[in-house]
Amino acid sequence: MKKKIAGVLTTVLAASLLVGGNHPVTVQVDNMISGTQDDEDTQSDGAEVEAEEEQSEEAKVAADPEDQPAATETPKEEKKAEKETQKREAAENSSDSTSSDEKTLLRKAKKLAQQYDYTGAISVLKNNWKFATSDKMQEAAAAYMKKRDACVEYPLENITHVFFHSLIVNTSLAFDGDSDEAGYNQMMTTVSEFKKMIQIMYDKGYVLVSPHDMAVINDDGTMSKGKIMLPEGKIPFVLSEDDVSYYHYMDGDGFATKLVIDDNGDIKCEYKKADGTVVTGDYDVVPILDSFIKEHPDFSYHGRKGILAMTGYNGVLGYRTDGAYKTKKNLQDDQKAFLKANPDFDYDKEVKAAKKVAKAMKKNGWEFASHTWGHRNATSSTAAELKTDNKKWEKYVAPILGKTDMIIFAFGADIGDWEGYTSDNEKYEYYKSRGYRYFCNVDSSQYFVQITSEYFRQGRRNLDGYRMYYNPDMLSDLFDVSEVWDSSRPTPVPEM
C-alpha cells in the first residue's frame, strides 16, 4: 500500500449524557476521518472563481412575407375566443379518452403526490383549463384531497438525524491492515451496509425530510417551527454525509474518487478499480440514494434528499478547487504529489466542473452545509480561528456550492452546551452574522432538536462500524444491525 500522511486519521470518542432529567449533553463525539487542516498550512493568494455562464439560444428566422398567406384582420378578443373554442373542440373530438396533455398533467401530479405534496398535485390539475371537462383529472384531484386530509402533523422533536462518511466500495482495499484500517472500520459504512439500511428504513415507513422543513425563517428574520404532514405511520428523518471531498489520503483505499454527471444527466461516482480501470456508477451515498428514490419516490418528502457537509482544503466533490492548487503556495505533501502526477491540471476547468455538478445536485433535492473549511474543532478552536476558517469557506467553497445557512460541525463538536446558544456566545454571534441559522452536532440520543426564534439545532447519529459493533441496541429503531452488518468488516472494531 501507499505511504500515508501521519496523523491524518483522527478519532474522537463521543458520549451523550443525560443531565438534570432528560436534557442531553453533547460531549466530543466519534465523528471524523480527517484531521484538522491548520490555517497556517494552506494560506494562499486566492483564486478567481469563474461565474457559470448561462447561454440562451435565439434562433428567430424571419420568413419571406411573399411566402405567407394573406392575413384577415380579426379583433384580439375574437381571435382569443376562436383559439379557445378550437382547443376545446379538438379535445372533445379526440378518440383517446385521455389526451397527451392530460396524461402529462396526471403524471406530474402523481409524482408530487407520491412525495406527499398533495397540495401541489391538486394545484397542477385544478389550475389547468382542462380540469373542468376532464373526469380523470377531477377524480385524481379528489383522491389527493382525501389523502391530504388524512395526513397528520409529525412532532418535530421526534425527528432523528443520521449521518455517514464516504462509503467503502472495496473492503479488501479499505481493510488491508495499514494505518488507516482502524479509522475506516470505526467511522465508515460499506456500500452493502448502506443499501440494506435504507431498504429496511423504507420498509419501516421512514421518509427523508430537511431541517428546512422542520424550521422556517420568516420575512422578518425570525425562525418558527415548520409543519410536516405525512400519512399515519410514516416517520420523517434527516440524512447527511460528511466530508464528500474524496480526500487525497483515501486514494487507492476502495472509495469513490469524485461525483460526476453521466450521459443521462444523473449524478454518479467515478471509482478507480484495483487494476486502474475507472468506472462510473452508484459508489457512494448520493447516487445510491438517487437511484433508490427513483424506484421508491415515497422515500422522499417533497423531493428532499440529504445534506452534504463540506470542507474545502482538498477541494469539493472530488475536484481540487482550493486556491492552493492554483497558487501552488503552502501545499501539503499530498497536494504536491497530486499536482506532480497531473502536470496538465487546469484549475479553472476543475472549478467549472465542480460547479456544474453542485448545481445539478441542488436541482435534484440535495443540500450543502459548511463542515468548516479546514475541518476545525469548533469547541476547542477560538472565535478568531473559526472566523479565519469561515472566510476561506466563503472564498473557496461557497462560490462553487452556493451560499448555505447550515453548518454541521466537524468532530461532532459544538459551540454551546445543551441549554442553547446565547447572545454572549461570540462563536454563535459570528456564525449568525454570516447567515448560519441551522446548526448540527453529533449526539447518540435518538432525538435532540432545539428550535428557537433565532436558530435550529439538531443532534446526529453515526451509523458506522463503531456504533453498530458497540451499541447495536441504540439503532434498533432504525434496523437490526445483524441484518445489515457486512461480514467482510474486521472484528473486533477497534475501540476509541
Model regions and ranges:
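Amphipathic coiled-coil/heptad-repeat helices and related helical stalk/stem segments
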Residues: 105, 194, 353-354, 424
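Sec-dependent N-terminal signal peptides of Gram-positive bacterial secreted proteins and lipoproteins
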Residues: 2-26
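Metal-dependent polysaccharide deacetylase catalytic core of the NodB/CE4 family, i.e.
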Residues: 157-177, 181, 221-223, 230-237, ...
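A short beta-strand-loop structural module common to alpha/beta enzyme folds
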Residues: 212-213
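C-terminal active-site subregion of NodB/CE4 polysaccharide deacetylases
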Residues: 113, 119-134, 142-209, 224-231, ...
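N-terminal, intrinsically disordered, polar/charged segments of Gram-positive cell-envelope systems
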Residues: 23-150
